[in-house]
Structure formats: structure tokens, C-alpha cells
A protein has these predicted regions:
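Catalytic-core loop-and-flanking beta/alpha module that positions acidic residues
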Residues: 1-265
Length: 265
């Protein structure tokens, strides 16, 4: 099944060049409110640990998305839903990452918290009600159930009909764990040494340095890419898109139904 992403021609060029899709940190996306919801006894701001790539399943054109993300001059990308390179943990669970756990400078990524699947956004009256109890403290340890992070938006955003791929990337402030300052922790046996730092970092809403993460996609997904040109796209811009797609022989390019039907003011 194809899913769709409204964006600029420049972003299309970057996707094709690097063969990756960018996941942006939730406090960097258009809905500012999403990243402001606190959770648990320390009011932890979980939005800064969720990274999302935003799509829609709606094949029918969405004028709101054309306007919000392209000002009617960009493109709509259509790619297969299973576009990403993934790694099976079991027959029913694929992840974006090929190691159980990986530490970087001030964060860690766990494969079991990062299922490679498209998640429908839920549009609700009070998103904060679904976030406030994700983080709990028991016996001086932080427990967190991340499944609700980054999937609730206020109902006024319903026009987007959004679905997301999501990464959960947790904080580890290096000042609490000397060993992380010296080398990467890719060995699962070292995980317990970082748990105290993880709990303290969550309590403080420590903001990790990472703003985005680019995830690799399959060559065959790009080989079958569909591009729709925006309602106000010029012939010159079409020529640029055609040049970008010369290496992908099965591509499809078509114009928006609304070309010539919108008076841009």
C-alpha cells in the first residue's frame, strides 16, 4: 500500500540522494503543543524523546496539506508503507535497529522500543490526559511505557489525517555516567550501569543533543516512487523533478487535480 508525504522538491532531492527518510524530534514539528505535555511526578517532557516521520494514508489529495507543507508549489511523495530497512526480532515484530541497545553521546536506543510500523495519530480533546501517566516512579526507579508517546494530537489537527513512523530515543546525561564519556556502550551487559543516569535524566527532562535521525529505506521502494506535482508547480519545477528521478525507471509523475483550479493570492 502506498502512503503519502507532502514536502518540497528540495527534500525530495535529499531523500533520493541519501536514500533515507528523516525523523524529526517532536519538539521540532509543526504542532508546538505536542512536546509540551508533561508526564509523571516530575512532569517529564517526553516529546523531546520521540522522533517522527509524518505521512497520510489518504490517496485523495488534501488541500490543507498542500498549503501547510508546500504552499501549493511542492510535491507529494508516494512510497510503499514497508519502505524502511528493518530487522526481525520475531515473526511478528520488526525493528529499525540491528542491535539490542546502542548508546551514543547523551542518549540510547533500544530495538524493542522501536517497532518499524506505521501508527495512526489519534485526534482527541485533551492529549495531555493520555500522556500524564506514561512515566511512573516506583522504589526510586522510573518506569515508562512509551507506546502512547507521539501519537495523540488535539482534534483540531484532524484535517491532516496523519499516520507516523516513530522512534523512541531515551536520554542519558553523560555527567552521571563517566564510562559513557569515554566510549560507546553497545554491550547489553553495561546497560545496568546507565540505568541510574537514565532515571535521573528523565526526572530532569534532560534534552538530548539529537534533533533528527535519518533512517535508510529500501532501493526497491524508491524504484517505485510516485510523485504528484503541487497545484502551483511550474514546468521548470517539473523538469527538475524529472531530472531527479532519472535513476528510478519505474517512477510515476503526475499533476495535482487542482492544477489551474486554485487562485493563489
Amino acid at each position: 500500500m502506498k502512503i503519502y508525504h507532502y514536502t518540497s522538491i528540495e527534500n525530495l532531492a535529499l531523500i533520493l540522494k541519501h536514500k533515507t527518510i528523516r525523523f524529526s524530534r517532536l519538539d521540532q514539528v509543526d504542532d508546538v503543543e505536542e512536546a509540551t505535555y508533561g508526564s509523571g511526578p516530575y512532569n517529564t517532557l517526553l516529546g523531546q524523546y520521540a522522533f517522527v516521520s509524518c505521512w497520510t494514508k489518504e490517496e485523495k489529495e488534501n488541500l490543507a496539506l498542500w498549503n501547510m507543507y508546500t504552499k501549493y508549489k511542492g510535491i507529494r511523495i508516494g512510497l510503499d508503507e514497508d519502505m524502511f530497512i528493518t530487522y526481525p526480532i520475531n515473526p511478528n515484530f520488526k525493528t529499525f535497529f540491528n542491535s539490542y541497545i546502542k548508546f551514543e553521546n547523551d542518549y540510547f536506543i533500544s530495538s524493542i522500543n522501536n517497532e518499524a510500523k506505521l501508527i495512526d495519530v489519534n485526534y482527541v480533546t485533551s492529549p495531555e490526559d493520555y500522556i500524564k501517566d506514561i512515566v511512573k516512579e516506583e522504589n526510586n526507579m522510573i518506569n515508562i511505557s512509551p507506546k502512547n508517546i507521539g501519537i495523540y494530537k488535539r482534534k483540531e489537527w484532524d484535517c491532516q489525517k496523519e499516520s507516523r513512523f516513530r522512534l523512541i530515543i531515551f536520554p542519558v546525561n553523560p555527567k552521571y555516567v563517566e564510562i559513557i564519556q569515554k566510549r560507546k556502550l553497545d554491550d547489553f551487559s553495561l546497560l545496568t550501569q546507565a540505568m541510574g543516569a537514565f532515571c535521573q535524566s528523565l526526572k530532569e527532562s534532560y534534552k538530548i543533543s539529537l534533533l533528527y535521525k535519518d533512517m535508510p529505506i529500501k532501493k526497491e521502494a524508491l524504484d517505485n516512487i510516485e510523485i504528484m506535482l503541487g497545484p502551483n508547480t511550474s514546468e521548470g519545477e517539473r523538469a527538475i523533478v524529472e531530472a531527479l528521478l532519472t535513476s528510478f525507471p519505474n517512477h510515476i509523475i503526475k499533476y495535482s487535480y487542482f492544477k489551474g483550479k486554485i487562485r493563489i493570492k
